[in-house]
């Protein structure tokens, strides 16, 4: 038993780059800085967002993801992919938002939540402060949840020798052994089968235990997945106290299964609006899975349950390709060649568009209703007394659902992966496409359900899969709608490159123009005809 009166005298905690990985890449290949660095290759527009945050950047001499100028983002990805050789050097992310410079592993939280037991000693802790805009936080129920399990903690030692904890991650959320096989219902399409898994527990598994299942496995696959590369897709569920978040959140995850089955080092490619401050402190970036889910302020697991669809691969080439492509997308995103617009350029669409640009066919599910969008445009404008809100509604109704709804995207991706596994999918003819790589290298598909971490926040649920479900979760009394107002974060003009290409007009611009013509020409014409008719009838 550790000496509960002892204090840490050895070099604990350790630097976040001293052990483990960031996705596929050894953490030791990176160095820790903040965004004010002047000797790193990360572009200035990216560094600006992290001037007061700890980030990891590739060490000198390592190839970093780049970008092309005067070209649309996904045209850039397609052109880069077409010219990329099979033996290309790894292209490291331009940055990883590690959030905290130090970590400890295999720790236990004391029942009073005041210290961590590790390596035979005791490390006094305190928790990072709650962000003022954050409406809930870690509480006594969180301590009870963490006190029963081994933990990885990210944070930093302060001047008083206390470890200021930013992240607590349960190490028993792992893939140490191949998960038990879970047969899919034979009479269900893959999309519906996955939806059933996500919804089979109350609240979408928010209050349930961590669970992992094998959904498909190649017969020749070995039963030891340790060290295997993975390409995963994460969907976070709907929040219980934010009526803008019933559809959840989507991201692509890359990495490898650690020798002890750990998954916390996987890299989550999180896209989030850059032009507003997040009430939870979220900044769009590649981020370790443990911090993405379990940061005390921004961790998605504090707000809702989460689900991971994991493709276990025989080779890492598909994973490396996707991560390198996402590095280019991040560069274009930070410099505002790719601008966040929630209906059409969001966490889901950016991820799905990247997969499609690399040659993985994610079939479209179609829009919610083009007819309703066009016919309802003047109604929305009159009801909301805002043409801008009518445009927003139009764009939500006309975008393909796999580019808008996280649950629709992961369901469709699951179906696509199963088709690749059976040889029935349509892929690009070139062997170098992502679809062909996955068809050749896919060894298994696993499903992970990660519960919500108890805190003062309301329980979340499985994500809404379409607009009808989303509307059903909204309060009928509009005065009870919960929305968190956040301040804007304007992009500095000094960082805006002069080669940026104009964004394509939103689809709603055509609707606004068409209805404007109707109002300016059509209605006056009808009035004139009616007047002539009345005069003639006298």
Predicted regions and their residues:
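Residues that flank catalytic or metal-binding motifs in active/ligand-binding sites
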Residues: 44, 247-250, 376
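Long, charge-dense tracts
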Residues: 5-213
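Active-site nucleophile-His-acid catalytic modules used for acyl/amide transfer and hydrolysis
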Residues: 2-9, 13, 295-388
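Short, aromatic- and cysteine-enriched interfacial helices/patches
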Residues: 375, 527-535
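Gram-negative bacterial Sec-dependent N-terminal signal peptides
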Residues: 1, 535-538
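Glycine-rich catalytic cores of cysteine/serine-nucleophile enzymes that process amide/ester linkages
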Residues: 189-193, 211-306, 425, 440, ...
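Solvent-exposed soluble domains appended to multi-pass membrane proteins
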Residues: 357, 361-363, 379-488
């Amino acid at each position: 038993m550790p000496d509960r009166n002892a204090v840490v005298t050895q070099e604990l905690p350790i630097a976040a780059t001293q052990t483990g990985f960031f996705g596929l890449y050894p953490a030791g290949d990176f160095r820790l800085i903040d965004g004010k660095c002047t000797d790193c290759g990360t572009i200035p527009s990216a560094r600006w967002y992290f001037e007061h945050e700890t980030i990891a950047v590739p060490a000198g001499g390592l190839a970093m993801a780049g970008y092309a100028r005067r070209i649309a983002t996904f045209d850039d990805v397609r052109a880069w992919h077409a010219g990329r050789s099979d033996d290309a050097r790894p292209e490291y992310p331009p940055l990883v938002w590690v959030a905290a410079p130090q970590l400890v592993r295999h720790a236990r939280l004391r029942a009073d939540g005041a210290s961590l037991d590790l390596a035979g000693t005791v490390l006094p802790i305190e928790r990072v402060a709650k962000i003022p805009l954050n409406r809930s936080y870690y509480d006594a129920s969180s301590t009870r949840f963490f006190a029963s399990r081994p933990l990885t903690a990210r944070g930093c030692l302060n001047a008083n020798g206390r470890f200021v904890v930013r992240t607590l991650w349960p190490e028993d959320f792992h893939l140490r052994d191949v998960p038990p096989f879970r047969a899919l219902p034979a009479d269900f399409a893959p999309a519906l089968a996955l939806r059933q898994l996500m919804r089979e527990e109350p609240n979408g598994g928010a209050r349930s235990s961590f669970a992992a299942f094998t959904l498909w496995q190649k017969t020749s696959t070995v039963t030891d997945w340790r060290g295997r590369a993975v390409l995963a897709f994460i969907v976070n569920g709907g929040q219980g106290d934010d009526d803008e978040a019933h559809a959840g959140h989507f991201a692509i995850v890359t990495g490898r299964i650690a020798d002890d089955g750990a998954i916390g080092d996987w890299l989550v490619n999180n896209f989030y609006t850059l032009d507003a401050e997040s009430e939870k402190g979220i900044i769009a970036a590649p981020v370790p899975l443990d911090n993405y889910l379990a940061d005390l302020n921004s961790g998605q697991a504090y707000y809702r349950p989460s689900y991971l669809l994991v493709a276990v691969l025989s080779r890492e080439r598909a994973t490396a390709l996707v991560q390198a492509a996402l590095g280019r997308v991040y560069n274009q995103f930070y410099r505002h060649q790719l601008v966040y617009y929630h209906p059409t350029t969001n966490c889901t669409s950016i991820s799905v568009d990247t997969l499609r640009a690399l040659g993985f066919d994610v079939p479209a599910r179609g829009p919610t209703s083009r007819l309703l969008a066009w016919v309802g445009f003047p109604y929305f404008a009159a009801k909301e007394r805002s043409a801008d809100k009518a445009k927003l509604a139009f764009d939500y109704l006309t975008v393909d659902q796999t580019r808008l709804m996280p649950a629709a995207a992961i369901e469709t991706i699951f179906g696509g992966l199963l088709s690749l596994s059976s040889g029935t999918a349509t892929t690009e003819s070139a062997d170098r496409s992502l679809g062909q790589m996955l068809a050749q290298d896919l060894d298994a598909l696993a499903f992970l359900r990660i519960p919500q971490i108890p805190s003062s926040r309301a329980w979340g649920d499985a994500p809404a899969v379409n607009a009808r479900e989303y509307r059903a979760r909204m309060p009928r009394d509009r005065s009870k709608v919960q929305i968190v107002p956040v301040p804007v974060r304007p992009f500095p003009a000094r960082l805006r490159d002069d080669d940026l290409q104009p964004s394509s007009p939103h689809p709603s611009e055509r609707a606004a123009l068409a209805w404007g013509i109707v109002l300016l020409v059509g209605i006056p014409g009808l009035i004139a005809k009616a007047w002539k008719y009345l005069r003639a009838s006298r």
